[in-house]
Amino acid sequence: MASTDPRRPNVLYVISDDQGSWALGCGGNCEIKTPVLDRLAAGGIRFENFFCTSPVCSPARASLLTGDIPSQHGVHDWIRAGSVGEKRIDYLSGQTLITDVVAGHGYRCALVGKWHLGASDVPRPNFVKWFAHQSGMGPYYGAPMIDLDRPCIVEGYITDVLADAAISFVDGEKNREQPFWLSLNFTAPHYPWIDSHPKAFTDMYDDCRFDSCPQEPPHPWFTGGKPAIERGASERRASLIGYFAAVSAMDAAIGRVLEHIERLGLSQSTLVVFMSDNGMNCGHHGIWGKGNGTRPQNMYDTSVKVPCIISQPGRIPAGAVNRDLLSGYDVFPTLVDYLGLSRDSGREKPGRSFAPVLDGRLSEDDRAVVVYDEYGPVRMVRTSEWKYVHRYPDGPHELFHLTTDAGERENLVGDTAYTDIVTGLRSRLEGWFEKFVNPLRDGVNKGVTGCGQLDRVENAGSQRTVFGAGHLVGADWDLWLEKKDTLK
């Protein structure tokens, strides 16, 4: 059957969509209901300070798959063109993914859910199952999917459909000798939120105060602007009910998959990884959105900090909370090491393996003390005490003293008392990115706006437009306000 060896475990790799670290019960939010994920954390390790590599879906997901930063793999914004059909674009063509590595060591790989890296209608090499969302967002009922290479519209609530597909895949693997790798990528809790989720879950929040989602004045850089906030004020509560319900429905769906794995006797030989692609602001900082919820793009912790839980009963310590600063680019080397696979001796990747943490044997000297982030011309370096955000070519830049200003309210970058801090952090940021950037894919000079990627960055010098200059008819905030189901 599928692997029963704890040292060569199956992998269930679950990624949620637009879920901030604040949107998790075991993360300290007493309003949101996530009992399954809370139990998963109680049986494994919850990572308190885990950061995406870019605060928007496609580049963050590409980094999880490749172990590279956006300015190396070339995906700098959410994929707006090239998902299906004759004009499909494989944005990761020629690059080695973590699934390629594990497949080379005998794993049978499956994708169930969101891909959003182009060419969704062509199964990626080394996948034995490919049930992918056609684009990257859409309605929760009647979702457009690709079943292997066949387009289809699925009936039912997509969160449940994906869980059913995951269970079906595991069932098909139970009598095989090889271990499996199952990427279960939910579209939840990405919008649409209003009138989009089962009543059983929206009813959970009828009496919720939503104190975890502050009502703040609109951020001056908010892409929706003040009129949008004013129009949407009356629907704020309905939006939050939908967002919270989407998380809880996903939590229940994950529970069904975990119960099935347990029923087959595979729990102790299955590594479960749960995280989100990027964070999300639901009114935090006066923003509805993530990194591209403002122009210029932002790097607030609510945008870049994501939930992360890793569990394998009997091997990973139970009930631990790790507070090291870790990033999406650390996942690739960590999984390679944890699974006991051979490392590629080629080009150095930016990530540091935290596999020793999973085995409970990391020393203080080995702990990560800094993380980096990028979104086109916006780059961030963050320590436990300071965050510096640099926007090329000439600002506005930001410096936050996180020890005394965890909410990132007071920008100190113009205060001469902190000149040395800024100089040191900027030098550190520039040196690190210089080491890992591919000059042909450097996001600093590609014109990334937060409005979507239309082509591979290698074509930036041609006559083709690579990055959108403005949102489609129906930007993030339009969908929230007007209850649209898809981008038109």
Placement of each model-derived feature along the sequence:
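Active-site-proximal cap/lid insertion segments
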Residues: 2-9, 16-32, 55, 134-329, ...
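Active-site segment of extracytoplasmic enzymes that catalyze sulfate/phosphate-ester chemistry
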Residues: 9, 13-16, 20-110, 129, ...
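Short, solvent-exposed turn/loop segments enriched in Gly/Ser/Thr/Pro and often Arg
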Residues: 26-30, 45-68, 76, 111-122, ...
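Polar, surface-exposed loop/tail segments
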Residues: 34-35, 64, 114, 123, ...
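Well-ordered beta-strand scaffold positions
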Residues: 105, 150, 384-386
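Short, structured coil segments at secondary-structure junctions
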Residues: 125-126, 167, 304, 384
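Short, surface-exposed beta-strand/loop micro-motifs that present aromatic residues
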Residues: 172, 377-390
